[in-house]
UniProtKB/Swiss-Prot annotation:
Protein name: Protein FixB
Pfam short name (any one): ETF
Gene Ontology MF term list: electron transfer activity; flavin adenine dinucleotide binding
Alphabetic keyword roster: Electron transport, FAD, Flavoprotein, Nitrogen fixation, Plasmid, Transport
Length: 353
């Protein structure tokens, strides 16, 4: 496939990962992408670079560069400007596209977050290149082409997409799809600085104020340590409260399988599976979920999977670590009661032991 690449793109090399900052901290998906980017770079025999964009002198950008090297980057690109203090599409797009045009990476990876999706789309459009969104697997073929795999047709098929005649090859990956690599104390590589050639007057959007999202009801399932989810086996929408009660008792979050979203019982941000959230909690409790392959793909990275289902032949028992053949509607309240008693202060030390 590479042999058909136009001549002007044949000198593109190296793998880049955009390091996303969230409230001054590196977003976990960027660390996951550094681990995946390291594998791709090693297969191609090229360098892995972290790309950091932010305000000058900020502790966040310094930490981002340190994390990039600790998780596998050989070098980092840094764009600093007061215009980059907060995310706005125009200056971030300008910074990243100018970097790409000047340094010619072969592969550019971003997290499929709200920010990453917005930035990736505008950068790909500006550069007139291809973008494969929400990938679940990344690899390189024998000729070095990026093979970006993502679910399609509602998760019933996996499609591998190639960017044949454009560069860079761009892809976004959802949080928790890739494993988090080990942090390693490595020598600091080169830091290449680049100026943002833009004026405030050229930017249409202005940041006026920030409002705390501490009361937000939006799910953050991708990074929850404990997740309790329900499926059609719950029978009625009012039984979702059983999930919420158990999740609250365990200090976790709650979600559901795709059919409950289709019924309108829960919003899409609570959907778990190949076409929803991919999760890697320490404990995953699935109540009344049959365990179709699309759901399995989204949860199989969990440390411990506990399945509750009335059907002993349900597919979920094939990959659950612990299985309970029971009616989830009656079993969940009993389980919540047991954990509530066990987690009382006087019993907590004994429970942990």
């Amino acid at each position: 496939m590479k042999k058909g690449l136009p001549k002007q793109f044949q000198d593109y090399r190296n793998v880049w990962v955009f390091i996303e900052l969230e409230h001054g901290q590196v977003h976990p998906v960027s660390i996951e992408l550094l681990g995946e980017g390291r594998k791709l770079a090693d297969k191609l025999g090229v360098h892995l670079a972290g790309v950091v964009i932010g305000p000058p002198g900020g502790q966040g950008t310094a930490n981002a560069i340190a994390d990039a090297f600790a998780y596998g980057a050989d070098l980092s690109y840094l764009v600093e400007s007061p215009l980059l203090a907060h995310y706005r599409n125009e200056p971030f797009t300008k910074a990243l596209t100018d970097l790409v045009l000047a340094n010619k990476p072969e592969i550019l990876l971003l997290g499929a977050t709200t920010l990453g999706r917005d930035l990736a789309g505008s950068v790909a459009t500006t550069l007139k290149t291809g973008l494969t969104a929400d990938c679940t697997e990344l690899n390189v073929d024998s000729d070095g082409s990026l093979a970006a795999t993502r679910p399609t047709f509602g998760g019933s098929l996996l499609c591998t997409i190639y960017t044949l005649k454009c560069r860079p090859q761009m892809a976004t990956v959802r949080p928790s799809v890739m494993a988090t690599p080990q942090r390693v104390n490595r020598p600091t590589g080169s830091i290449i600085r680049h100026d943002l050639k833009m004026l405030e007057e050229e930017i249409a959007t202005k940041v006026l104020a920030f409002f705390s999202d501490c009361d937000s009801t939006i799910a953050n399932l991708a990074y929850a340590d404990v997740v309790v989810a329900g499926g059609l086996g719950l029978g009625a929408v009012q039984n979702l409260q059983l999930l919420k009660d158990l999740a609250r008792t365990l200090g976790g979050d709650f979600g559901c399988s795709r059919p409950l979203v289709q019924k309108g019982w829960m919003p899409f941000d609570r959907q778990i599976g190949q076409t929803g959230n991919t999760i890697r909690p320490k404990l995953y409790i699935a109540a009344g979920i049959s365990g179709a392959v699309q759901h399995r793909v989204g949860v199989e990275g969990s440390d411990l999977i506990v399945a509750i289902n009335t059907d002993p032949n349900a597919p979920i028992f094939d990959f659950a670590h612990l299985g309970v053949v029971a009616d989830a509607i009656s079993f969940l309240p009993a389980l919540t009661e047991v954990f509530t008693k066990r987690l009382e202060p006087r019993n907590l030390e004994k429970f942990v032991q």
